[in-house]
Regions:
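Active-site catalytic motif of lipid deacylating hydrolases and related acyltransferases
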Residues: 2-57
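Active-site nucleophile loop of the alpha/beta-hydrolase fold
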Residues: 13-14, 34-39, 81-93, 117
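Catalytic histidine-centered segment of alpha/beta-hydrolase-like enzymes
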Residues: 43-44, 144-156
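Conserved alpha/beta-hydrolase fold motif
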Residues: 61-62, 83
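Gly/Ala-rich beta-loop-alpha elbow adjacent to hydrolase catalytic centers
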Residues: 63-72
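Conserved alpha/beta-hydrolase "acid-adjacent" motif
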Residues: 120-127, 149
């Protein structure tokens, strides 16, 4: 597997951090992940935080897992940055100020790919497939779990995005 040269911003999930196995599995020279305390920050604060980070880092690609997948979709659409989402939380219910991902967030021409391990014990990935399949490429694998059994699978999707959409 070759090394990835694109600048990647990884958005971790709820109760996770930059110590995430998903972040460390990404084989990229320029990868960034900033810890966010989602539980204690309201939606607008997190949105402004990610907008500021994107302006500073200027990533070529967003990669998000779980709640980070939710934010990757939001930021991808707002900033027109390609994204890869892994077992995304499309309707976060841990706070009342989060609105579910809907057609407005998905119906655009920005390259996005979903990597789904269907054995997720926290989120129903079959419902995620139904919601996303009309809008983006999906790579779904049987088994796995919410934290991802094979986070290294993200690398070939990142390579594909880099070769196809990132000059």
């Amino acid at each position: 597997m070759k090394n990835i040269h694109s600048k990647i911003l990884f958005l971790h999930g709820l109760d996770s951090s930059k110590e995430s196995t998903k972040f460390h599995a990404i084989n990229a020279e320029k990868k960034y992940c900033i810890d966010v305390d989602y539980r204690n920050l309201n939606y607008k604060t997190v949105e402004c935080f990610y907008q500021d980070i994107i302006e500073k880092i200027k990533p070529d690609l967003l990669v998000g897992h779980s709640l980070g997948g939710y934010w990757a979709l939001k930021m991808s659409q707002q900033h027109r940055i390609p994204a890869i989402i892994a077992n995304p939380s499309l309707d976060p219910d841990f706070r009342e100020d989060y609105v579910a991902i809907d057609e407005h967030d998905l119906d655009h021409d920005i390259p996005q790919i979903a990597y789904l391990e269907l054995g997720d014990e926290v989120l129903d990935m079959y419902k995620v497939v139904e919601q996303l399949e009309s809008y983006m490429q999906i790579e779904a694998v049987e088994g796995g779990h919410h934290r991802l059994v094979q986070p290294e699978n993200l690398n070939h999707l990142i390579e594909y995005m880099e070769q196809t959409f990132i000059a």
